[in-house]
């Protein structure tokens, strides 16, 4: 029997449906329902949010399938789940469970330091993190249907997400202004498919949606990332590590939608309680920097 896999066009189209929205990390059915009621376009099912993964240390793996199954049964919006970088079997298990997207994630401890997954071996679409155009292009070349900035997960500090989004947008503009004979050299330097760079030159954008993630903790943070060109945002620890998750969730969704309405964002930001406690990224040791995982 011939293996059936989803085409790039179909999988990228599925990801396009999340454009302009907020995707929230959840660890149980109750949180998933809060996210759905707040207006999240999808949820990411985990055993622990990134800040807890960071605090616990050790090896972080795919969540217990019971957690993922609980979330799948609790909501009608799409459910994502994380697999370790390069871990073919974790990804196949998640696909068999019926998740809507798989995140090949640097938040988990990489299983393979040489190879990322060949996403075209799967029917389910993949989302992958990137710090710059080179990383984004390589993941898209492997079949990723959605890109997100890596940021620095679990810190509540947006500085790295801003750095990654600004760098990616600047590099896209550079490629758009290159002559066609410069593209091959650029493709070689980035380790990216020439045809992908040609698409970027002709359209001025990636062929997939590009979300912001890593350190988004407030409505203003979400609006900032949209202002910088993100197609939507992932919020990991920022919601359920806040004082008032329901209120934070609704406020971040609304700020993402109305990111240029600054009076509205001011109102949304009132009386939310404390945001999650943040970490100064500059204090992290090299081994603690999740964004450096993958290539």
UniProtKB/Swiss-Prot annotation:
Keywords: Lyase, Pyridoxal phosphate, Schiff base
GO molecular-function term, one example from the UniProt record: pyridoxal 5'-phosphate synthase (glutamine hydrolysing) activity
Top-rank taxon, per record: Bacteria
Disulfide partners: none
One record GO biological process: pyridoxine biosynthetic process
SUPFAM superfamilies: Ribulose-phoshate binding barrel
Gene3D superfamilies: Aldolase class I
Chain sites annotated for binding D-ribose 5-phosphate: 25, 154, 215, 236-237
Active site, per annotation: 82
Binding-site list for D-glyceraldehyde 3-phosphate: 166
Pathway: Cofactor biosynthesis; pyridoxal 5'-phosphate biosynthesis
A Pfam family assignment: SOR_SNZ
Main enzyme class: lyase
The enzyme's E.C. designation: 4.3.3.6
Keyword Lyase listed: yes
InterPro entries per record: Aldolase_TIM, PdxS/SNZ, PdxS/SNZ_N, RibuloseP-bd_barrel
Catalytic activity: aldehydo-D-ribose 5-phosphate + D-glyceraldehyde 3-phosphate + L-glutamine = pyridoxal 5'-phosphate + L-glutamate + phosphate + 3 H2O + H(+)
Family to which this protein belongs: Belongs to the PdxS/SNZ family.
Role according to the record: Catalyzes the formation of pyridoxal 5'-phosphate from ribose 5-phosphate (RBP), glyceraldehyde 3-phosphate (G3P) and ammonia. The ammonia is provided by the PdxT subunit. Can also use ribulose 5-phosphate and dihydroxyacetone phosphate as substrates, resulting from enzyme-catalyzed isomerization of RBP and G3P, respectively.
Subunit note: In the presence of PdxT, forms a dodecamer of heterodimers.
NCBIfam families: PRK04180.1, pyridoxal 5'-phosphate synthase lyase subunit PdxS
Protein's UniProt name: Pyridoxal 5'-phosphate synthase subunit PdxS
Annotated organism of origin: Shouchella clausii (strain KSM-K16) (Alkalihalobacillus clausii)
Origin organism lineage: Bacteria, Bacillati, Bacillota, Bacilli, Bacillales
